[in-house]
């Protein structure tokens, strides 16, 4: 293969396509290898469609590949509303996210988000870009949030907090086929939290220094995805090592601080049972820590993404796990012009989890629920509504919230 000619690529640089299709033009031509790389490139979010043809080159034994690339839309906007926040700062809220792909022409991705509820606001921004044709990716992300307690009886004493984080991530795909993807990487994470009472710094958690805690963490990440037409399996493992660097909070003597070791494991499996039987979704998370942790790094349990039927962050501890099984049954499906589907599904599920600090019995703080849900998926709108019954009864609250009745919902508009 002596040459690859790319057309229709717009701002996407031709080298982005050619280096992934055939990085070594001197290598012997292999149709099967080219086809696999072609199909892998079709999975790239920058590309909507590709058409190619091979013709003889100028010299005997040479071939030229003509490629016509149709780019995917390089920008987008999502607006979401839900009740997936802790009631103490206002569970009802919204978030808007704008994103832009390929700003430089080298496959980078830029996104900015802003979210707010009655007592909270947050800003999040990230930029990632590819370092080479092997898709080694470097990314940076910054987030900042302000929170005020708006729930009685604590609202009147003016409790506030600020959180800030900055992450730098380097990830490389070590093995990639049309079915499998194995990635490993490292993250340097800087996180800081400040808490205030009546406008004055105040410590509410063990390990804080005058209302302030700070961690510098090295995270080693491994992820694996196995995907076919009938199932998808995603596994992720994160080893976190708290470092005594960059003014991290360090005490010693058994007091929670930023010098620690912890492991977080995450798994999700989805299996299509058949066109009329729907799908089965299994999920699980677990965190184990060798030491007492600052609140910044603890495991949060309860709410829409862990154990439904309870308040968001019902339990916050050093260690914890949650598992979930959900069956989704299709009620109605329709295909519209342009090939986009509309799907309405009913769901039934069961969630279970536990969280504990070092030295505590893991079974003393259990959350267990079962319930029903309704899900809508379409090109422009996704919506979820879940109701769950708390089998392990939650403690009564003075201020009522929808989450106390096991109601969790989310609506997302895509543009």
Model-found features: residue ranges?
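C-terminal transmembrane beta-barrel domains of outer membrane proteins
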Residues: 239, 250-415
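Repeated loop/turn-to-beta-strand initiation elements of outer-membrane beta-barrel proteins
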Residues: 75-77, 104-110, 133-139, 147-148, ...
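Flexible, solvent-exposed coil segments and beta strand-coil junctions
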Residues: 47, 72-78, 102-108, 145-152, ...
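Periplasmic polypeptide-binding modules associated with outer-membrane biogenesis and secretion
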Residues: 1-85, 113-122, 283-286
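Feature captures outer-membrane beta-barrel proteins of Gram-negative bacteria and organelles
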Residues: 94-103, 121-142, 164-173, 218-226, ...
């Amino acid at each position: 293969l002596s040459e690859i000619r790319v057309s229709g690529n717009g701002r996407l640089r031709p080298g982005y396509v050619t280096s992934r299709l055939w990085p070594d033009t001197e290598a012997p031509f292999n149709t099967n290898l080219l086809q696999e790389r072609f199909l892998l490139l079709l999975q790239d979010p920058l590309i909507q469609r590709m058409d190619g043809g091979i013709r003889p080159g100028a010299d005997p034994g040479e071939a030229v590949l003509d490629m016509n690339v149709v780019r995917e839309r390089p920008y987008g906007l999502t607006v979401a509303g839900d009740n997936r926040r802790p009631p103490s700062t206002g569970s009802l809220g919204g978030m808007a996210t704008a994103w832009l792909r390929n700003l430089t022409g080298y496959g980078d991705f830029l996104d900015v988000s802003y979210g707010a509820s009655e007592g909270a606001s947050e800003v999040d921004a990230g930029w990632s870009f590819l370092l080479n044709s092997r898709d080694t990716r470097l990314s940076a992300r910054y987030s900042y949030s302000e929170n005020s307690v708006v729930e009685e009886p604590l609202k009147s004493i003016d409790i506030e907090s600020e959180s800030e984080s900055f992450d730098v991530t380097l990830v490389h795909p070590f093995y990639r086929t049309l079915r499998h993807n194995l990635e490993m990487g490292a993250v340097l994470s800087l996180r800081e939290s400040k808490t205030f009472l009546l406008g004055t710094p105040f410590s509410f958690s063990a390990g804080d220094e005058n209302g302030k805690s700070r961690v510098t963490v090295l995270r080693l990440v491994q992820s694996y995805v196995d995907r076919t037409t009938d199932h998808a399996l995603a596994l992720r493992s994160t080893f976190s090592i708290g470092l005594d660097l960059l003014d991290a909070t360090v005490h010693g003597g058994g007091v929670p601080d930023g010098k620690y070791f912890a492991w977080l494991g995450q798994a999700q499996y989805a299996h299509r049972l058949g066109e009329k039987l729907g799908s089965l979704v299994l999920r699980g998370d677990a965190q184990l820590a060798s030491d007492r942790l600052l609140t910044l790094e603890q495991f949060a349990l309860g709410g829409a993404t862990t154990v439904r039927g309870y308040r968001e962050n019902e339990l916050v501890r050093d260690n914890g796990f949650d598992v979930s099984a959900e069956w989704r049954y299709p009620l109605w499906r329709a295909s519209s012009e342009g090939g986009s589907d509309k799907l309405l599904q009913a769901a039934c599920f069961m969630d279970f989890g536990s969280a504990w600090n070092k030295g505590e019995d893991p079974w003393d703080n259990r959350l267990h629920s079962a319930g029903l849900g309704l899900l809508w998926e379409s090109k422009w709108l996704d919506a979820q509504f879940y109701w769950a019954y708390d089998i392990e009864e939650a403690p009564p609250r003075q201020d009522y919230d929808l989450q106390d009745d096991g109601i969790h919902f989310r609506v997302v508009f895509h543009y």
